């Protein structure tokens, strides 16, 4: 008699979300990179849907492929076009609950990103240009006064 050995149920969790650029402005293409880890040893191989969301809209849906090895980690990415304001971006593992897991409560992680408008950066640039012009004007004025006082 052969008794099959069942693999334990997996436990997938989002361990990290990184984004680049770190300080996006409106219109930037922001690359989100999520690390997904199976916390259970020796579970069976699995293809897992991963959803990137901005809370309202789906940013990207991709697939993480796990081989069933011990403490396996897989990295997945999505690209989001930055809009102005504060955002809570979310990565959700198996959003439709198609895969049975030993723990379904750790299948999502959120990050907060603040996006400034491109105009904010333009305002700072304008101020720097204005300050530079004032400094150049002062230096030129002092040079003229120095020149006139020598005559």
Model segments located where?
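Extracellular/luminal regions of secreted and cell-surface proteins that mediate adhesion/ECM remodeling
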Residues: 1-123, 129-133, 137, 141-150
